[in-house]
C-alpha cells in the first residue's frame, strides 16, 4: 500500500522541488499536489513545474484553494493522506 503525501503550494519553487525529490526517491509514495496557480508569481513557471511533475504516474494534481473547506475535505476523503506539508501562501 502506498504512503500518501499531500503537498500544498505544489507548483511553487519549494513545493515542486519537494515533490520532485520524493517522486524520484520513492515509487511507493503517492504525492498529491494542490495549488491555486494564482498570479502572485509567474503562472507559466508554475505550469512548467507541474508539467515536469506530471511525468510521474504516482503524482496527482488538483487546482484549488486550501481556504475552500469543501475542496480540501474532498481531497482528504479521496486520498486520506498520512503526511501533509503546507507550503501554500495565503494572502490576507
Q: Where are these predicted regions, by residue range?
A:
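N-terminal Rossmann-like NAD(P)+-binding domain of SDR-like oxidoreductases, especially those catalyzing
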Residues: 1-90
Amino acid at each position: 500500500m502506498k504512503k500518501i503525501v499531500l503537498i500544498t503550494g505544489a507548483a511553487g519553487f519549494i513545493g515542486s522541488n519537494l515533490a520532485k525529490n520524493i517522486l524520484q526517491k520513492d515509487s511507493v509514495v503517492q504525492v498529491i499536489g494542490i495549488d491555486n496557480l494564482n498570479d502572485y508569481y509567474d503562472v507559466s513557471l508554475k505550469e512548467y513545474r507541474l508539467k515536469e511533475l506530471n511525468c510521474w504516474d504516482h503524482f496527482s494534481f488538483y487546482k484549488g484553494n486550501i481556504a475552500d473547506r469543501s475542496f480540501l475535505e474532498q481531497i482528504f476523503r479521496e486520498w486520506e493522506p498520512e503526511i501533509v506539508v503546507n507550503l501554500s501562501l495565503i494572502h490576507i
